Each structure stands twice: as structure tokens, then as C-alpha cells.
Swiss-Prot record:
Keywords: Calcium, Metal-binding, tRNA processing
Origin superkingdom: Archaea
A Pfam family assignment: Archease
Similarity comment text for this entry: Belongs to the archease family.
Protein name as annotated: Protein archease
First and last residue of the signal peptide: none
Taxonomic source organism: Methanosarcina acetivorans (strain ATCC 35395 / DSM 2834 / JCM 12185 / C2A)
Biological role stated in the UniProt entry: Activates the tRNA-splicing ligase complex by facilitating the enzymatic turnover of catalytic subunit RtcB. Acts by promoting the guanylylation of RtcB, a key intermediate step in tRNA ligation. Can also alter the NTP specificity of RtcB such that ATP, dGTP or ITP is used efficiently.
Binding positions for Ca(2+) per the UniProt entry: 16, 145-146
Length: 146
């Protein structure tokens, strides 16, 4: 995996939270970006469970697909109160100028006593958004509004 085997790392940002996610494949960078985002909200190491939600989305480009993917997971957390810890992207494809993702996120019901809340994320932003293929895989830079 790129960057010495790291899945993600957090970077300095004045007001919000910025992270880089890495992956050998495009699917893996989407999975690791989701993990990085949820580790801002809670400690995913304390989450288990196999409550699953399927996510299928279509967007005009890969960068928008990444933002839509993370935003949908954030929405599911807020509405269904599920904390996710495992992400499996089954497919990302381009067809007729649009990109789509089919994935499954797994986790468990959110209980404040079991999952201490660390940071509230208001939104996933396009600010400083980057998604690029590198010599050794893929890299995504994401800023979330807190």
C-alpha cells in the first residue's frame, strides 16, 4: 500500500479536519477515506457488529463520487444512528460519462455509552479535494467541516 502501508493520515488544517487516504486500488482508497472519516467521529477500534447498509450512488466524476460516498455514510450515521467500522467497495465504474459505486458499510447501533463521541462532522466538503492515481496506487485528500 502507498505511503509505507498507511491507510490514512491526518494533516494540519486551521478550522476543519483534513486527511489523506491511500489505497493500492481506487476501491481501497474509497474504503480508507471512509475509515478515516469515521475515526474522526468515534474510535472505530471499539466498534464491531455486522449491521450492513448497501450504498449505490452515481456522480458526474470521481471526485464528486468520493464526496457523495462519504456524505451518504455520514447521513446514514446521523439518521440511522449506525457507527461504521468496515467498508467494502464492490464496484466503481464509469459508464456513459458518469461514475457509480456499489458498496457495503458494516457497523453497529450507536450508543453514546459504548461509543464516546469524539468530533461532530457537519459536512464533507470540496475544499482542497484531491483524488489522484500515483505511481504506487491512489491517494485522496479530503476536508470535513466540523
Amino acid at each position: 500500500m502507498p505511503s509505507q502501508g498507511k491507510k490514512y493520515e491526518y494533516l494540519e488544517h486551521t478550522a476543519d479536519i483534513k486527511f489523506l487516504a491511500y489505497g493500492n486500488t481506487l476501491k481501497e482508497v474509497f474504503e480508507n477515506a471512509a475509515l478515516a472519516m469515521f475515526n474522526v467521529i468515534i474510535d472505530t477500534g471499539k466498534v464491531s457488529g455486522e449491521t450492513a447498509r448497501e450504498v449505490c450512488l452515481t456522480s458526474p466524476d470521481l471526485e464528486s463520487l468520493l464526496v457523495d460516498w462519504l456524505s451518504e455514510l455520514l447521513y446514514l450515521f446521523e439518521v440511522d444512528e449506525i457507527v461504521f467500522w468496515k467498508f467494502r467497495v464492490e464496484e466503481i465504474r464509469e459508464e456513459e460519462g458518469e461514475y457509480s459505486i456499489k458498496a457495503v458499510a458494516s457497523g453497529e447501533q450507536y450508543y453514546p455509552e459504548s461509543h464516546p463521541f469524539e468530533t461532530e462532522i457537519k459536512a464533507v466538503t470540496y475544499n482542497q479535494l484531491e483524488l489522484e492515481k500515483t505511481a504506487d496506487g491512489w491517494k485522496a485528500q479530503v476536508v470535513v467541516d466540523i
